[in-house]
Amino acid sequence: MKSVTRPAPARNRAVRKTLLAGLIVASCATAAHRQLDERFGRANPKRFDFRRESPDAPASPTLLSTTSSSAAPAPSFRQDVLPLFEHRCVVCHGCYDAPCQLKLGSWDGVARGASKQKVYDGERLLEVRPTRLFEDAEQPSAWRKLDFFPVLNERTPGPANDRLGSLLYRMLDLKRRHPLVQQGVLPGATFDFGIDRKQTCPDLTEIGSFEAEHPDWGMPFGFPGIDATEQELIARWLERGAPHEDLPPLGASVELQIHAWEDFLGGTSLREQLVSRYLYEHLFLATIYFEDDPIRTRFRLVRSSTPPGQPIRIIATRRPIDAPGVRRVYYRLARVRETIVEKTDMPYALGPARLARLREIFFSAPDGVVALPSYDVDVASNPFVAFASLPARARYRFMLDEAQLTMMGFIKGPVCRGQVALNVIEDQFWVFFADPEADPRGLQDGFLRSEATDLRLPAGWGSDAPILVPWLEYRRLQDRYLLAKSQFLEQNLARKKVDFSLIWDGDGSNPNAALTVFRHFNSATVVKGLVGPEPKTVWVLTYSEFERIHYLLVAGFDVFGNIGHQLNTRLYMDFLRMQAEFNFLQFLPIKDRRPLRDLWYRGAPDEVKEHVYGHAAHFDRETDINYQTGHPKSEFLDGLARRLAPIVDQTYDLAAVLGRDADTLGDATLLTDLQSLARLRGASLGYLPETAILRIDLARGSPLYLTLVRNSGHSNVSSIFKEESRILPAEHTLSVVPGFIGAYTNALYIVPRSLVRRFTTAVAGLASESDYAELASEFAIRRTNPNFWRYADTLQAAHAASTGGFHGLLDLSRYENR
């Protein structure tokens, strides 16, 4: 029989093509590495490995890392190089979302290098290995095994190699050779500054082609280059092998306080161990300092496998709630080794009063801890199970004491980045809290124990979660919980007045009782005080919502998790927002609750509305507040503001600030002019960036810095998709806030005092992008301004001064190009 040759199936041809392409890529990569070996010598991933006894101890670089034939003294990393990095590099490369994971706020970050893997990837199907600086690897050679590539020269040392073999130098030199234009906007076809843009992260084998294809993409990306003196400083430092010095030693007083706090956190009784675990899971993101330390050395609370007195050995787990893998956990204070940036700065002061307060909260009641909870994911992810042995009132009191910090965990933590993560909240709202003594909601331990199963959180599914199944389960659980909660309220508020007394007043002295949250589209801010115009929505948080927000978005969230984990986290937050709004509606007359709910949720399905107030979440008791007007929401907020007036923070109150500022006291019309700006409403505000710094140059004295926060109107925020279809331009408002709001500066306007009214008129008249371009041409400092860095340095200095010098750097990576 004659044989017949049959064509290969299409799948086989595709496989062969894929294999062939892979072989070509591999051979090209091999050739590129061979060329590098010939030019710079063989790679030595251990060149910059160092010796450090513990994460909070000084590092001693190996001799090889500083080897150079040059006899000239090397610049000091801490005194010369790091300050330059901070004001030119860290302003874009300092946060979780630093491009290419290149964090330049420490020598460790520089030595770690860059990665092609994105931290934020809302489409990943499987979890990825965490890559947290100072935590998931230590030595540069260990980071190479995690697919990080060097930006320093890890090949044969020498002045020429240490410059030209360094990606850091090559990117800076690319900008020197191809500077930006010095006016107007940068071409959108060449420059994409969106946070979800495709990242291009060339390694040393690719830098040549990158330079040829993208000559305008030198560093700092999209900004003017550093000057010749600064460039020479970096070059000399690199030529000397990129050396670095130890951190300055801690003072004796700080060492003593570290010992005292680690002793407190290292208690051996079951209750002491459980309290320490609870504190750690709430403070692991905080930037801790001692209140009497004049330089505010920052620390982080970490889990260590070693006790106090021994070098810290950090227990690196995906989440702080995960099993530590050791028999005994020690909670230690590890020194922060990198530049503090505003996005992640969550200050928490330690001192004698704090220690006494924690003892009072957690140790004054009888000891009810008979066994330690496990770290099984179903237990550890549910604080109502894990910490059931600690009184709910104690846990709530701890969170209330620093309520802004607790909210910061959500606002400043890894979860708070990008539109999808943030379109679960309105652009501006006020937050109040149920009084821990007067309001029984969420504070009866028996009720919480009985409902603990229904209060499960998405972290219980781990970081590789299915997409749909968990949400369906949580919706069912929340329906059951809302029914039980409604019945509980009917029974337990029957003999209490539903009035202002149920709202926490800060115990007469704590300004954390009233907070304002701003959403800036893809980032957010929380501050003390009632800031901005009256918001559309208001939250009243009980312990149950407050604790779940933390364990949903902070302690239980894994930024390296898959799409299922991230999506379920976002969807669950809808429940918590609606429950906080439900708590507020209870204070209004029954006849006004549904109409206000419907205003908040215009266009949302009826099923969603019923979860805010209706058959799913109901409270049929009439309020005991005697309303006198037809606007009960406004009347309630005015009355509550008067009640809280002794403790409401005035830092961001425009009238209060101008009234005590010596440079503005003589200007009788400035407040009126700024209030006119703040009263603007409507579509014209949609052309402003999310946040902009307004610098008013006064006739005398220092400039006045304010933040313009655009609050976008929405028909509702109940859906994760198609937010643009729910934007209501006619309902845009503007908050004009003294000082600085937000971690990301989108624009800087410089307006002479005499032109404030003209600026207001220009903003009110915005009707197109060309209108905004005219405004920007007159008042904005654009990316292309040749003096951009001088203005930026002045801005950072003013921000530092506003916080007493203890601040995080403002991030410029989202600065506009318009």
Please state what every model-predicted region is:
Residues 1-3, 176:
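Short regulatory "switch" loops immediately downstream of catalytic or recognition motifs
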Residues 4-19:
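Bacterial N-terminal signal peptides that target proteins for export
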Residues 18-22, 35:
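Acidic/proline-rich low-complexity IDRs
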Residues 22-30:
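Hydrophobic h-region of N-terminal signal peptides that target proteins for export
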Residues 30-818:
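Aromatic- and Gly/Pro-enriched helix-to-coil junctions and flexible linker segments
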